[in-house]
């Protein structure tokens, strides 16, 4: 099981404001879809509500303190249960936000797919601080949206120091 964080953020690590993403980059959405299709995605309730529907061709797992029995979504109350269910569906588990969910899974992640967007926007939701010395950049692709005049970069990082593994019970059932 590999846990990967996937996120796009502007300067100051802004990932959202008022439950919305403060930019619209089609290539980033395409990148997100290409990376996550066929895999498990874990998100918080607010992220799910901002998307408004389950993401197609993925196992959608929503972490929430108050499950509401959402159709076509698996709701869980903790990261251990999220990982247990997700690992039965796919080898790579993508953590897609929001802020609190990224914070919970960052110590467990072995890979990060980040889109750094070179714009300043106001935000109330942020990607967590992370220690760059714990990670190695595997790839970087610098891009520009000519219609919006926005520069951005797709980055892929792998953790270089050992990280916390969460051991699942051997007799766990999904």
Locate the predicted segments by residue.
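Conserved small/polar residues in nucleotide/adenosyl-binding loops
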Residues: 164-170
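Enzymes that bind and transform nitrogen-containing heteroaromatic metabolites
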Residues: 1-162
């Amino acid at each position: 099981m590999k846990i990967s964080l996937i996120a796009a953020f502007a300067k100051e690590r802004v990932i959202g404001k008022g439950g919305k993403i403060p930019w619209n980059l089609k290539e980033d959405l395409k990148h997100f879809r290409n990376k996550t299709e066929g895999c498990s995605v874990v998100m918080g309730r607010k992220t799910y509500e901002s998307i408004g529907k389950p993401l197609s061709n993925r196992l959608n797992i929503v972490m929430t303190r108050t499950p509401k029995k959402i159709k076509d979504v698996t709701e869980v109350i903790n990261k251990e249960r999220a990982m247990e269910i997700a690992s039965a569906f796919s080898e790579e588990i993508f953590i897609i936000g929001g802020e609190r969910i990224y914070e919970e899974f960052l110590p467990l992640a072995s890979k990060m797919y980040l889109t750094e967007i070179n714009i300043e926007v106001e935000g109330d939701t942020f990607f967590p601080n992370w220690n760059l010395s714990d990670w190695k950049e595997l790839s970087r692709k610098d891009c520009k949206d000519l219609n919006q005049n926005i520069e951005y970069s797709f980055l892929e990082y792998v953790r270089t120091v050992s990280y916390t593994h969460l051991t699942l019970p051997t007799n766990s059932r999904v």
